[in-house]
């Protein structure tokens, strides 16, 4: 599906977010520009799931804010997001079963029992519930309240909503567990610096590319957010994307120093261990890996791998 990550840093003064660029339309997937970061005011919205469903949720939020701009204040924004998510999810889950009767979910709750009778009403209710459980769309929303350090990392999904204030970071999508694992291993926390957090979040994104079904795209977007101050121009965005060149540097560091792999030195030892417990037999795969590992070790030590080492006489032949 995807991965979206957010982590507060500098004691809540900044938030670093990341996502991939993989889009899924039924059985078809492809990578384009990372369009999973959207803004409404200074709130950043990221989603995991179907783009069109996310658009429906955003439209509900926008309609609510037109009637009352305060619904997007720090005090009310979570309630607004949750209500919009629930409304869209309920409508989509009920539509296949109620639309043949020209009935909405509101109509069903009010008149369904009288209209259908208890037996059929309960069957329809179970069908709607089963359909709702199939939904896996998630939202991750970040921003600030009135306090300069009140960074909010808020998550909404099929199992409910969560506020990641204590940990300071959250992740959604199929790659979320891999992302969480890397953030925890790197000891990410709100007190981490901006530099450390950019690195940690990028590594969490790269690590998530090995998630279930390999459905996290390699294309990466990393954005640094900060709280708006009185000195900022009203129409100026309080965010900065990490450049593609810097993302390449981060991925190179990840590949060279942090990506999990069997070290060359370990490869030499484990090949011998396997041979000792397997009657001296070594698989062709292990032999090739062993040879290549030894070549790289020799290159590091400045030893030629073109010919085997042989002892040389130190006696003067003259």
What are these regions (language model features)?
Residues 231-237:
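Extended charged low-complexity segments that act as oligomerization/scaffolding linkers
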Residues 1-126, 132, 160-199, 237-318:
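Conserved short S/T/G-enriched processing/targeting/catalytic segments and their helical context
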Residues 204, 226-228, 248-254:
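Accessory, usually C-terminal, subdomains that scaffold auxiliary metal cofactors
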Residues 194-198, 208-223:
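Flexible, glycine/charged-enriched surface loops at secondary-structure junctions
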Residues 144-160:
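Acidic-glycine-rich active-site phosphate/pyrophosphate-binding loop
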Residues 2-8, 13-17, 133, 137-145, ...:
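Short beta-strand scaffold segments in enzyme catalytic cores
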């Amino acid at each position: 599906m995807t991965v979206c990550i957010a982590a507060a840093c500098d004691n809540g003064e900044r938030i670093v977010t990341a996502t991939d660029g993989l889009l899924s339309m039924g059985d078809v997937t492809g990578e384009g520009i990372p369009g999973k970061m959207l803004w409404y005011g200074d709130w950043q919205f990221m989603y995991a799931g179907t783009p069109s469903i996310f658009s429906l949720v955003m439209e509900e939020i926008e309609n609510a804010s037109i009637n009352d701009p305060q619904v997007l204040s720090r005090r009310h924004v979570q309630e607004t997001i949750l209500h919009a998510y629930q409304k869209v999810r309920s409508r989509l889950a009920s539509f296949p079963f109620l639309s043949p009767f020209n009935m909405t979910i509101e109509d069903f709750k009010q008149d369904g029992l009288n209209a259908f009778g208890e037996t059929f009403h309960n069957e329809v209710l179970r069908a709607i519930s089963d359909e709702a459980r199939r939904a896996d769309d998630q939202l991750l929303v970040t921003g600030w309240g009135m306090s300069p350090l009140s960074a909010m990392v808020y998550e909404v999904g099929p199992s409910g909503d969560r506020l990641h204030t204590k940990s300071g970071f959250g992740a959604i999508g199929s790659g979320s567990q891999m992302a969480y694992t890397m953030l925890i291993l790197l000891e990410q926390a709100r007190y981490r610096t901006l530099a450390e957090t950019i690195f940690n979040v990028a590594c969490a994104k790269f690590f998530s590319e090995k998630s279930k079904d390999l459905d996290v795209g390699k294309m990466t977007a990393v954005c640094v957010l900060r709280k708006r101050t009185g000195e900022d121009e009203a129409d100026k965005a309080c965010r900065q994307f990490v450049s593609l060149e810097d993302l390449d540097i981060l991925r190179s560091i990840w590949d060279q120093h942090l990506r999990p792999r069997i070290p060359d030195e370990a490869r030499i030892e484990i090949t011998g261990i396997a041979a000792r417990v397997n009657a001296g037999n070594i698989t062709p795969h292990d032999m090739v890996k062993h040879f290549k590992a030894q070549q790289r070790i020799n290159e590091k030590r400045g030893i030629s791998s073109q010919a085997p080492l042989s002892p040389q006489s130190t006696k003067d032949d003259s």
